[in-house]
A protein has these predicted regions:
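N-terminus-centric sequence/structural signature that marks the extreme N-terminus
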Residues: 1-146
Length: 146
């Protein structure tokens, strides 16, 4: 099981105090280590900080998180824990609609589903999950769980 943590505020610029907030994110990772000892990562932007520890199950090499994709100059970032039972179907549906994948991970399927379908994409997910998506364009942090 992976671990996810973070913080968000549109009233604060976390990058102005990068060392402080980077340290906080790293402390979060340390606390989550037992939930995902295989890999870990952080993401820090003006409005948002995310931390992730990973227990590698699928796409062991390319499923690193936080996973970042760019659209029209804006970043979309996901930290994810879970298992989708309909990964293959969603992936094929997105490929047919022109989406391109860099990995075979559930994480990327979830993020690209969000980018393609918008916030209602979660209704398409069949599985067990908890995740956060940072939407830089709309300056939002979206939290989801099954």
């Amino acid at each position: 099981m992976c671990g996810i943590a973070g913080f968000f505020s549109t009233q604060k610029d976390y990058c102005k105090e990068f060392p402080r907030y980077d340290h906080i994110l790293n402390q979060m990772k340390v606390r989550l280590y037992s939930r995902g000892p295989d890999e870990n990562g952080t993401f820090l932007a003006k409005e948002c900080g995310l931390a992730h520890t990973r227990l590698s199950i699928r796409d062991l090499k390319a499923g690193s998180q936080p996973m970042i994709r760019q659209r029209n100059g804006y970043r979309y970032v996901i930290i994810y824990n879970g298992e989708l039972y309909n990964t293959k179907e969603l992936r094929n549906e997105l490929i047919q609609r022109g989406e391109q994948f860099e990995t075979t991970s559930d994480t990327e399927v979830v993020l690209l589903s969000f980018l393609y379908y918008g916030t209602d994409f979660v209704k398409k997910l069949d599985g067990i999950f908890a995740f956060a998506i940072f939407d830089e364009f709309h300056e939002k942090l979206l939290l989801y769980r099954d």
